[in-house]
Every structure is written in structure tokens, then in C-alpha cells.
Regions:
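Aromatic-rich beta-strand edge motifs centered on tyrosine
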Residues: 109-114, 135-142, 247-250, 272-277, ...
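Beta-turn initiation residues at beta-strand->coil junctions
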Residues: 96-100, 123-126, 150-152, 259-263, ...
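Sec-dependent N-terminal signal peptides
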Residues: 3-15
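Short, hydrophobic/aromatic-rich segments at coil-to-beta transitions
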Residues: 55, 88-96, 117-123, 226-231, ...
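Short, surface-exposed coil-to-beta transition loops
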Residues: 92, 103-108, 122, 131-136, ...
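Gly/Pro-enriched, hydrophobic low-complexity segments
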Residues: 108-113, 120, 124-129, 138, ...
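Long terminal segments
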Residues: 20-73, 131-240, 294-344
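Amphipathic N-proximal alpha-helical interface segments
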Residues: 69-98, 241-260
């Protein structure tokens, strides 16, 4: 009996020793991966290399009567690989969040394993307007289980599970932005609505467009704006760097206008999306593309069912009745909804 007990104790000790060794190896890997990620961020866009990063900035006036202004910045750092002959974005290797509201501050880092794209480490630092600081660090194994956590105070604001949820939220945002036009399906089976005569509909769209342009311009001049900026620097080092800048304008009812600019040494592009205030349906889209001295334009006007009722273009050989624009607009709305916590 004593021999069996001794054997059991030895097995338990051996298992504990192996677990400790595995944890030590994992912690060592996390720290080396973190150091490498920081080096990549520091070198991003330097030494003749194309920058590869994405930033989301959302500005919100929380209350018109009380000046509580909310600003959130999300930086995603990624790499690109050639997959089947195409330059393909990889999931980000590091995500950084900066948030501020009326003196309250928050800073986050999420480290992603560059091999299996799973979360390895999360860091959060929060500070109140009174100067109270909370710091938390979470280390995860390959299965996503927290193997160690460190806090500077007993009253932690976060937990291993909530930080993983935040990381998944950030990754979903990254995918929505970078696969814009291919992610959110269109609802093609919804019941048909009654439509207004074409001439009346076009007049309505043009009037709303003029109002949206005026409103977005006023927002740009405002000290406290309500808008979302998305800036992406990408393309591989064998191609000219490209910058895509998207501005989503919104009010208490939701999105009313979006503009998007894309620039590289080879081409320039510009898009606009106009939404119906009551239903938030896309009612007009515009695209302008300039390449090698040639300029192409497309304008699509939509009825109450999202069907294109008028197309104006300088390139009649390439038109799709706004199908891609509708999908792109749907994804941009999904990004906004996800950021505001009311996704479908």
C-alpha cells in the first residue's frame, strides 16, 4: 500500500514539474514574441518598407447638454503574404487601444500569435480623472486558457475572459474593414416596399445629398465632431504603398454619409455613400477612379427596395447596378454597429 502511495506522489510531483516547465516555456515564448512585435511596430514604414497598419478613430459627443466627449483609437499592425499569387493581409500581430472620456483614460495591448493567430497576452491600464491607476496583465496558453495574471491592485477592472472577448471584438473589426464588400450578405429576400415615382425619388435623393454634404462639412469644422475615421496603410513591398481613408458621419439616428479615399502612386479612388435618415438604407453611391490619365465615374441611385433605378457612368462597359457598393455600404454599417454595441 505504501509503495502505491509513494508511486502516486511521485507521479503527481512529476506532473506538477512538467506543468511548471510548460508554463515557463510558454511565458518565455510570450515575452520573446512581444519583444519581436514591438520591434516590428517600431520599424513599420521605415527603411524603405511600406507601412502596414490600420487605425480606427471614433469621436462621439455622449450628451449634447453635458460636454462628455468620447474618443477611441484602435491601431492594428499586420503583415502581408503572397497567397495564390495575391497579396493577402494576415491577422494583426499587435493591437493597441487608446480611449479617453472626461479625464478617464484607458490603454490596451493585445498580442496575437503570428503562427496560429490566437491571443497570447493582454495588457490593460486604466486611469480615472482622480489619478487612480489600475494595471492588469494576462498570459494565455495555446488553448486560450489564462496561465498567469498580474495586477497592481486587488480591485481589477478586467478578467481573463473579458480581455479575450475584447480581442475577438477587435479581430472582427479588422476583418470587417479589410474584407469590405465581401463580409456582410445582402438581404435579398426581404418583402418589397412600395416605391415612389422615379422623378420624385431622384429629387428626394439629390435634396438629401445636399443636406448630407452640408452637415458633414459642418461636422468637420466642429470642435467636437461625431465621426469615425478608418485609415489603412498597406500593399506589399513590391508594390507602391496605398493609403485608404474612410470617414463615417453619424448622428443620434445613425449613419447618414460616408466618404472614402484611396491613393497610391498608380491610382486614386474616391467613394461616397448616402443613407436614408429614417431607414438607414443606402439610396445613392458614387465612385471616381483615376488611373494612368484616365478618369472613370459611376453614380447609382436606389429605390426604397435597394434596386438601382438610375446609373450614370463614363464607363458603360463596367457597371453592376451598384451591387458591390451595396455590399461595401452594408459592411461599413456593420463596423459602425459593432463599435456602438448594437450589431445584429
Amino acid at each position: 500500500m505504501r509503495t502505491i502511495l509513494l508511486a502516486f506522489i511521485c507521479m503527481m510531483a512529476l506532473g506538477s514539474s512538467q506543468a511548471q516547465n510548460q508554463k515557463a516555456e510558454r511565458m518565455k515564448l510570450i515575452r520573446s514574441t512581444y519583444a519581436e512585435a514591438k520591434k516590428k511596430v517600431e520599424a513599420n514604414g521605415k527603411n524603405g518598407q511600406s507601412p502596414k497598419d490600420m487605425q480606427l478613430v471614433i469621436n462621439r459627443l455622449e450628451d449634447e447638454d453635458i460636454p462628455l466627449y468620447d474618443t477611441e483609437l484602435l491601431d492594428f499592425y499586420f503583415e502581408e503574404k503572397i497567397v495564390d499569387g495575391l497579396v493577402t493581409k494576415q491577422p494583426p500581430y499587435l493591437i493597441v487601444e487608446r480611449w479617453g472620456n472626461h479625464g478617464h483614460l484607458r490603454y490596451r495591448e493585445v498580442l496575437i500569435d503570428p503562427n496560429n493567430h490566437k491571443v497570447m497576452f493582454c495588457y490593460m491600464r486604466g486611469e480615472t480623472d482622480g489619478g487612480f491607476v489600475v494595471e492588469s496583465r494576462y498570459y494565455y496558453d495555446a488553448e486560450g486558457q489564462c496561465i498567469e495574471q498580474k495586477h497592481n491592485t486587488e480591485n481589477s477592472w478586467t478578467a481573463p475572459e473579458t480581455e479575450l472577448e475584447n480581442a475577438e471584438y477587435y479581430l472582427k473589426l479588422f476583418n470587417l474593414v479589410n474584407y469590405n464588400g465581401y463580409f456582410t450578405p445582402l438581404d435579398l429576400d426581404k418583402p418589397k416596399k412600395a416605391t415612389t415615382p422615379k422623378a420624385e425619388r431622384l429629387k428626394h435623393i439629390r435634396a438629401l445629398y445636399a443636406k448630407a454634404k452640408e452637415k458633414s462639412a459642418a461636422n468637420d469644422r466642429a470642435e467636437m465632431s461625431d465621426d469615425l475615421h478608418i485609415t489603412i496603410h498597406d500593399l506589399g513591398d513590391d508594390q507602391p504603398p496605398r493609403t485608404t481613408a474612410t470617414r463615417i458621419y453619424f448622428d443620434n439616428e445613425g449613419i447618414y454619409f460616408i466618404s472614402r479615399t484611396s491613393k497610391s502612386m498608380m491610382m486614386e479612388g474616391y467613394d461616397e455613400f448616402l443613407f436614408e435618415p429614417k431607414t438607414k438604407d443606402l439610396i445613392f453611391s458614387y465612385t471616381r477612379a483615376a488611373e494612368e490619365g484616365q478618369v472613370y465615374e459611376w453614380r447609382y441611385y436606389y429605390d426604397e427596395n435597394g434596386d438601382c433605378i438610375e446609373t450614370k457612368t463614363t464607363n458603360t462597359d463596367e457597371t453592376d447596378d451598384g451591387f458591390y457598393d451595396k455590399r461595401a455600404a452594408k459592411d461599413l454599417q456593420a463596423i459602425f454597429d459593432l463599435l456602438n454595441g448594437h450589431e445584429e
